[in-house]
Amino acid sequence: MLAPSSNCSLASQRLTPEGFAQLQSALQDFVATLPQAFYWDSRSLHTHLRTQTGDCAIAIAAGFQLLLLGRTAAEYCQPHPLSEPHHVSVQFGADSIQRYCQATNLPVEYQPALAQLGDLSLNPDLISQFSNLLIAAIAADRAPLAAQYPAVSVCQPLEQALHWQEEQDRLISQVSAQIRLSLDLSEILTTTIREIRQLLNADRAIIYQFKPQCLDAGLDQRWPLYIPSQSYITYEDRRNEALLSVIDPLVQPGLLITTEEWQRFQQGETLLIDSVGFYKERLPEQYSFYERVQVRSVCKIPILVQGRIWGLLVAHQCQQDHRWQPRERDILQHLAEHLSIAIYQAQLYGQLQDQTQTLENRVLERTQELIDALALAQAANAAKGEFLATMSHELRTPLTCVIGMSSTLLRWAFGPLTERQREYIKAIHDSGEHLLELINDILDLSQIEAGKAALQVRPFSLSRLATQTLNTLQEKARLGEIQLMLDLQLNNRVDVFRADPKRLRQILINLLSNAVKFTEPQGTVFLRVWREGDRAIFQVSDTGIGIPESEQAQLFQKFQQLDTSIRRQYGGTGLGLALTKQLVELHGGHIQIESTVGQGSTFTVWIPEQTLIEPVEPRPSIDNLPAGHILLLEEEDEAATVVCEMLTAAGFKVIWLVDGSTALDQLDLLQPIVILMAWPPPDQSCLLLLQHLREHQADPHPPLVLFLGEPPVDPLLTAQASAILSKPLDPQLLLTTLQGLCPPNLSEGDRPSS
């Protein structure tokens, strides 16, 4: 598109009044085919008004604004006949229309049409189409004009030159517009070669695009240079199908270029051959090719991109020898320059696309790698969590037995123990305690990292927590000849704190145990506790070996310890401080260390006060508990034990059955007030029980409460259940649900005992 400010005009032509009127009609029909069209001409004015405005026409449409001027007001007043031919001029652009209307006070409302367009740019294709209309009007008007006014023919060469210039400008504008609008080089070259052939009235137009590697490899050979057809790409346009196509490698197996031609091409010079007989003696192979494809005259123009030969623009005349004109050479050179710009843009765009694609591929590869790594890590983490969940009970139970039994043996046996026996049993006991401590740390750390740890927030006394924790380590400190000191900077007003006391106790035990472990005999360990606003600060200081500054950063990393000699002397796994940091951050707090080698270390922990969860409703009163039994169907011992203990502690009477067949047989005998069933069911017999309850809905039967580990397949089951609870069970929700489903207590004797 041409910018709206670039007003275009065509050279002035001469038309008779009849020819001008025909041109007005043709323009009106042309504009009517365009979107947002507006047309007005002076034929609608009275004759005396036309003597003031002159003959004109205004056409406005999307991409097209034109002012057509015929006889001026002054020419209307001249004495020569009105039938004489007059100059006709054409101006493009909204500015030309506005200036003319303001100068002549033309009575036409054109402004709304311009305002409706918004975009006042010009479309070169529409300008070209109107130029064809103008040429046709001049040609139709010229035949009678030549007979009446012979002098008009004197202007014919000038008109031809103007027409040629107009076509040249149109073609260059079209190529330029296509370059701006498209980055498809093949499309640009195909369109350009067709327009060039038509403009030159040539029989064949060709663009040869050399492949870079062919030139680099071929320039070292002997001259004339031979470029095989597989080393270039050919774009061709022919006048008709009767002419042979040079795209066919059987017709043109390659290009021959002489030394002189190549040197001229490198300088950007055009080669004009009016007769191919020029090659008969100089390059017989080339002459033979031209005879085969019927070429009489040839024009060759190099296309240079960044100073390097990219290809050739070639035109063939096949009917007769043709004397190439300078104007033909000039337009081909101009087009070659514009093509050079288009090619360079396409190359840059191609490089950018390649780089973009490469980067996108890298991003996709890295993203996929990250996705795979994440999936692998998630799978590993899930496997670890599943393993730890499965093994936690299996690990802790035998260790508890080992510790418990060895402790019992140390205190009681069927006879006196020898010193060695006592040492052996004590070694078993101590090793078991150490192993249990290690396993607990690993399981706790894994639970926190998996996001499964939750705080049990409640109010507690900071001073009592600190005192009890310190007392726990008194024996260990006494054996190491280390003095434990407690500094409580608290009063009764700030002593009560809301957090998870069990987790805080674990934090303090880890820090104090470390302090005792790394403090030499006769040393001192201090525990200081104070409040700062809504935060509690715990500080553990020791007079131990200290920690080098270079190693302090890795203290809170899992399985990280000090150097090997210290690890051999003091032991440890490197989990305690990592777990401590996780527990502190679980509270939303932070931990800090200050240490000097040979003087000791100080760990300071800041814990913000936690928000207390809503108080749990009181346990149902025994006086309000219903009479009767609750029937529990659960195959897992641990899950059943938890539910039984929970309900028994609340005052309910529970009957636990593993299979549904027993429950079905004894349903009338047991007469439960509620049936609790785990889903998926333990066995198929439970499904028979459900079917029985469904088929006897008309009869009174106890409410059904389901514990869901996964959603039920049968939608009728959901409708049949009186309540559905998710695993793991919420104790308060279970008790509240049962209280709502159970019938009221009718007799004192049937109440469950406490």
UniProtKB/Swiss-Prot annotation:
Domain Response regulatory positions: 629-742
Any one cellular-component term (Gene Ontology): plasma membrane
Region (N-terminal domain, not required to complement the deletion strain): 1-183
Entry keyword set: ATP-binding, Biological rhythms, Cell cycle, Cell division, Cytoplasm, Kinase, Membrane, Nucleotide-binding, Phosphoprotein, Transferase, Two-component regulatory system
Phosphohistidine modification, residue list: H393
Chain spans, region GAF domain, required to complement the deletion strain: 184-338
Gene3D superfamilies: 1.10.287.130, 3.30.450.40, 3.40.50.2300, Histidine kinase-like ATPase, C-terminal domain
Cellular compartment(s): Cytoplasm; Membrane
EC number: 2.7.13.3
Biological process annotations from GO: cell division; circadian regulation of translation; circadian rhythm
GO MF term list: ATP binding; histidine phosphotransfer kinase activity; phosphorelay sensor kinase activity
Reaction it catalyzes: ATP + protein L-histidine = ADP + protein N-phospho-L-histidine
Notes on the domains: The N-terminal domain is followed by a GAF (phytochrome-like) domain that lacks the conserved Cys residue for ligand binding, a histidine kinase domain and a C-terminal response regulator domain without the conserved Asp residue that is phosphorylated (pseudo-receiver domain, PsR). Autophosphorylation is dramatically reduced in the absence of the N-terminus (residues 1-183), and lacking in the absence of the GAF domain; removal of PsR increases autophosphorylation 10-fold. Thus PsR may suppress the histidine kinase domain.
Protein's job: Functions in an input pathway to the Kai circadian clock. Senses oxidized quinones via its C-terminal pseudo-receiver domain, providing a link between cell metabolism and the clock. Affects the ratio of phosphorylated to unphosphorylated KaiC, binds quinones via its pseudo-receptor domain. Quinone-binding destabilizes the protein rapidly. Autophosphorylates, does not transfer the phosphate to its pseudo-receiver (PsR) domain. May play a role in cell division, as suggested by its polar location and increased cell length in a deletion strain.
Subunit structure: Homodimer. Part of the circadian clock (KaiA, KaiB, KaiC, CikA, RpaA, SasA), the composition of which varies during the circadian cycle. Interacts with LdpA. KaiA and CikA compete for binding to KaiB(fs).
Protein name: Circadian input-output histidine kinase CikA
Highest classification ranks of the organism: Bacteria, Bacillati, Cyanobacteriota, Cyanophyceae, Synechococcales
